[in-house]
Amino acid sequence: MPDIQPITVYGKGGPNPPRVAIILAELDLPHKVIEVPLSKVKEPDYVAINPNGRIPAIYDPNTDLTLWESGAIVEYLVSHYDPDHRISFPAGSNLAALATQWLFFQASGQGPYYGQASWFKKFHHEKVPSAIERYVKEINRVTGVLEGHLSRQKVAADGDGPWLVGGKCSFADLAWIPWQVIVTAIIQPEDGYTVEDYPHVKNWLDRMMARPGVQKGMADIFPST
């Protein structure tokens, strides 16, 4: 791959910027991070970059593209900078379609519900037990989908796996890590969820968290000691 100018990443920490940081690390892509405090995301300078006023966003000088929404950024990075399909699949293939399916499920099924569960448990100004119960049920439902699917996937001859798609770790798996790990630090067993009830998911997360690229991408959430 020819020389690549550093990609600018706006925002760090929280559940969504690490999804992008993990992909950048896994693909060894040069980048620089500009911190955007949550108190600044609705100010004109940042809204000019992301009109939705959320993090992350990127600017890629190699293609002169500004892009926001972490799922769209993940898709963009692997389509442009993973020609050897280290963590992706050939464009137009069934495996590529399946990987996109899991990415969309993460965006629609994991992110909103896990975020609401975390909000009502940790940040809402008053306790609303019915809201916590509703969203924790969704965490269990979504994690149950992952558990069932992983339990049916084959393990490679070298012992690697199981993975969501194609017998290898791909962006389809990696996109799930931040929220799936963060929620275990906020939602406690007494709230009705523990990853220990999902052994295939726990093993899957442990294997991903052992990857250097994942450790680097998650460092803002869980710094090494």
From Swiss-Prot:
GST N-terminal domain ranges (all copies): 4-85
Recorded GO CC terms: cytoplasm
Pfam families according to UniProt: GST_C, GST_N_2
Tissue: Specifically expressed in conidia.
Pathway: Secondary metabolite biosynthesis
GO MF entries: glutathione peroxidase activity; glutathione transferase activity
EC class (word): transferase
InterPro entries: Glutathione-S-Trfase_C-like, Glutathione-S-Trfase_C_sf, Glutathione_S-Trfase, Glutathione_S-Trfase_N, GST_C, Thioredoxin-like_sf
PROSITE patterns with a match to the protein in the record: GST_CTER, GST_NTER
Domain GST C-terminal: 92-225
EC numbers on record: 2.5.1.-
Alphabetical keyword list: Transferase
Function of the protein: Glutathione S-transferase-like protein; part of the gene cluster that mediates the biosynthesis of trypacidin, a mycotoxin with antiprotozoal activity and that plays a role in the infection process. The pathway begins with the synthesis of atrochrysone thioester by the polyketide synthase (PKS) tpcC. The atrochrysone carboxyl ACP thioesterase tpcB then breaks the thioester bond and releases the atrochrysone carboxylic acid from tpcC. The decarboxylase tpcK converts atrochrysone carboxylic acid to atrochrysone which is further reduced into emodin anthrone.
Family membership noted in the UniProt record: Belongs to the GST superfamily.
Protein name per the record: Glutathione S-transferase-like protein tpcF
